[in-house]
Amino acid sequence: MSSRLREIARENAEIVAAGGYRTRSGRQVPLAAALAEAKAGTRIYGPNRIIPGEVPPGRGGATAVEVTGESSTVAARRLVETAGEAGGRAAWQAPEGPSVAVLNFASARNPGGGYVRGAKAQEEALCRASALYETLLEAPEYYAVHRAGVSTFYTDRVIHSPGVPVFRDDRGELMESPFRAGFLTSPAPNAGTILRQEPERAAEIPAALARRAERVLEVAALHGYRRLVLGAWGCGVFRNDPAMVAEAFRALLAGRFAGVFERVVFAVLDRKPATREAFERAFA
């Protein structure tokens, strides 16, 4: 845990309470209205199928897939900034809402995981960069269900947080020009714990990943997102096999969701080259 990261969480709480912040250049950036909309629009979906039958097709053409070594927020900003060039929705206050959604590799039982305590995983980084944490507090039932459960397979529920303000960069600096993105919060199965506590169920992990990834993509499609930021979901402390996670998404994007999304970025910010390479092989 990092004292500096705890301080950022504390500063973010002050920014939210104040309804905005002042940049280094002296510009006042308002966040209150955008955050109120995001909190009011936060919903829990699942665990059952969300879109019955076929998924409505996109605007035509194959989905472009990238595998990169950037963070989820850097990838999201890049997709938001280029959305207008491709006919997508624009970034900050477009009436239809942002065109980009980011998968949050979530803790099933604690909003933001260890964000308030200064932890360093992907969910915590997203919460430091944005107002995501505030929207997760709007979904207490999601966490109650998982706290009541014993198995670390968790459930196929997804929290959708629309139009969340993103206002810090990867260094923790406040942005001169924030942007908005949707967030899809879903925990991967905790493969490490399953292998220790329920080894007889290890063979169920691939199906659980595939089913849960399908729920994530259904929520994205339901809300009309055209650009997604995914990644090495559950491949850190949850110890899922990167090749297995990559294959779950590959099969869905080539199958039921073929052509539904314009662009999908797998942002794999991992010290181990093998993790990113697993996704590069899957989408070669």
Model-inferred region functions:
Residues M1-L228, A232-A284:
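Macrodomain-like recognition of ADP-ribose-binding/processing modules
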